[in-house]
Curated annotation (Swiss-Prot):
Family: Belongs to the universal ribosomal protein uS4 family.
Residue ranges constituting the S4 RNA-binding domain according to the UniProt record: 96-156
UniProt keywords, alphabetically: Ribonucleoprotein, Ribosomal protein, RNA-binding, rRNA-binding
GO biological process: ribosomal small subunit biogenesis; translation
Pfam families: Ribosomal_S4, S4
Annotated PANTHER family: 30S 40S RIBOSOMAL PROTEIN (PTHR11831), SMALL RIBOSOMAL SUBUNIT PROTEIN US4M (PTHR11831:SF4)
Subunit structure: Part of the 30S ribosomal subunit. Contacts protein S5. The interaction surface between S4 and S5 is involved in control of translational fidelity.
GO annotations of cellular component type: small ribosomal subunit
Role according to the record: One of the primary rRNA binding proteins, it binds directly to 16S rRNA where it nucleates assembly of the body of the 30S subunit. With S5 and S12 plays an important role in translational accuracy.
Protein name (Swiss-Prot/TrEMBL): Small ribosomal subunit protein uS4
GO molecular function: rRNA binding; structural constituent of ribosome
Length: 206
């Protein structure tokens, strides 16, 4: 399955919520009519079945983190095999992706831009270049922008934007050095309350 490269507003309208696919310079409501479904007429959504609700939640989370269907299924299997709550394990695995950590640290204004930085070898982990967006970052790892990319305007602007919106507590960043530490894997209470991971667990349990 190919990665979606079309309009981001279309995805937000499909899920009826902000997927944080845009930079956040303007409120999502001023850019996308997320109350209306995709299409010219933007019909209002009808009542969904339980399955439809579960599927939409999975698609929402998958799109937030920019993960393909097969990848997401793999993350779920890994989460189910670990101790603890499967839904929480799933979100933690997604949060530990390198492209997501780069986004959380503010080196990229969106997860898509952060993924591109990783793929273009602009990011290092513990001093070693890593170009795999799905690389799992561990507590204590140092994630940094490589010297060759430090002066990129988009990185400078992303850091400024992150300073405005605020940075999550589980990363510590030196904006001048463009380097940060992934302090710990976030607890479920640290993550978005707008995600209902139990619906995803119910979907995969069928």
């Amino acid at each position: 399955m190919a990665r979606y490269i079309g309009p981001k507003c279309k995805l937000a309208r499909r899920e009826g919520t902000d997927l944080f696919l845009k930079s956040g310079v303007r409120a999502i409501e001023s850019k996308c009519n997320i109350e209306a479904a995709p299409g010219i007429h933007g019909q209002r959504r009808g009542r969904q079945s339980d399955y439809g609700t579960q599927l939409r939640e999975k698609q929402k989370v998958r799109r937030i983190y920019g993960v393909l269907e097969r990848q997401f299924s793999g993350y779920y299997k890994a989460a189910a095999s670990k101790k603890g709550a499967t839904g929480e394990n799933l979100l933690q695995l997604l949060e530990c992706r390198l492209d997501n950590v780069v986004y959380r640290m503010g080196f990229g204004s969106t997860r898509a831009e952060s993924r591109q930085l990783v793929s273009h070898k602009s990011i290092s982990v513990n001093g070693q270049t890593v170009n795999v967006p799905s690389y799992q970052v561990r507590a204590g790892d140092v994630v940094a922008v490589r010297e060759k990319a430090k002066n990129q305007l988009r990185i400078v602007q992303a850091l400024e934007l992150c300073a405005q919106r605020g940075r999550v507590e589980w990363v510590e960043v030196d904006a001048e050095k463009k380097s940060g530490v992934f302090k710990n894997v976030p607890a479920r209470s640290d993550l978005s309350a707008d995600i209902n991971e139990s619906l995803i667990v119910e979907l995969y349990s069928k």
